[in-house]
Amino acid sequence: MKKITLLLLGATCALSAGAQIRLGDGQLSGSFETNSIYYVDDAKMTDVAGYAVPEDRFGSNNYLKLDYNYGRFSAGIQMEAYMPMLLGFNEIPDAFHGFKLASKYVQWQDENFGILVGDIYDQFGNGLIFRSYEDRALGFNNSLEGVRGTYNFGNYVQFKGLYGRPRLYMDYEDSWIRGADLSVSLADIFGLRDAMFTLEGSYVNRFQKIDEEKSLHQGVSDQVRPNLNMYSGRLNLDWKGITARFEYVTKGEDDLFSVGAKGNVAKGNVYLAELGYSHKGFSVLGSFRRLEHMATLLSIYGEGTGNLINYIPALTRQYTYLLTNLNPYQVNPDGELGGQVDVYYSLRNKSARYKYWNLHANFSTYYTLKENTQNNKANLLWRDINVDVERQWNRSLKTSLLLS
């Protein structure tokens, strides 16, 4: 039977609405978002592989969020309905389906102390060892169902600890995440008023019972242990236009889940450094990162792109225009080495501030780690050199020129 391919979106509807209501001394706020599409065939492109017509021509992702605030107390829920989920929303069949109370929380927050019970969204440092967040456009939500406590000792010390089980698509996994994050402001302790200087550290543990039958079926290494530990140390400095950020991450032995390496274990690490300077209309920022074996899963038995506990962004230029974003860089979590340099200068007319020139240049490049290649050489993964000039001629005319 000839397969009919689906290529044309016949009707698309995206709607978002919000409201606030006063309830005595409290306040109730709500928002509703729906993204719905009706699919039709494109008869001229029926031979393109990979786009089959779904059983239901209609796809709809819907989110209803309600929050109540009363002084230092707050509570909220989020309902989600996939009727069914949009085509191509996730590579896992039925990852999102039906109608469900997807998240909920109850929170108390005063000046120095806070506690939250429910679904937690948080991040330690740059997110290299832990980040729980929601991105509806990508169908991503890895919140933790559990408890989080925070404590601030003035501006000197900030501490938070959390414990919970992670969400994977519409359900919660059988793994458990616990972690703590500490930030100490040395600038405040020593009275350095013109600077921001902090030392920070984080710890994250993933615990999951080993199922030998599942491990054998999914090709998980028999060397994987129930406990996985990760540590992060960070230094942050801001002083008279100078910015410096350093972070080192170490990760215990974990299964290598990449194609061709699954069934083996290895330790992971990250070196991250950022140096920048800004003065008036000029700024320059350089970033360097080396990482190895940092794909950290919520569950060793989970599947899909939603099965991640950490966040490793691409340190490359994020373009404004669609054409230049057709081939973005994808981070290689198995191992990469590289960075970027970004330079910006703005020249403004002193008598007419709305008239200006913006000059911008960026260079980024990444290589594989030679230890992970068969020829023991670092191979080029990505290189991008770009320059753009933006000119605001008057209040109604602006031109942009980009070379990449």
Task: Please report, for each region that a protein language model flagged, where it lies by residue.
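Positively charged n-region of N-terminal signal peptides that target proteins for export
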Residues: 1-4
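N-terminal accessory beta-strand-rich subdomains and adjacent acidic, glycine-rich linkers
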Residues: 104-107
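Signature for the C-terminal beta-barrel architecture of outer-membrane proteins
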Residues: 21-27, 33, 37-59, 69, ...
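Hydrophobic h-region of N-terminal signal peptides that target proteins for export
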Residues: 10-18
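Acidic, small-polar-rich N-terminal luminal/periplasmic segments of exported/outer-membrane proteins
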Residues: 120, 124, 133-134
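Histidine-anchored nucleotide/phosphate-binding helix
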Residues: 62-66
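Extended catalytic core of nucleotide-activated donor transferases of GT-like folds
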Residues: 100-102
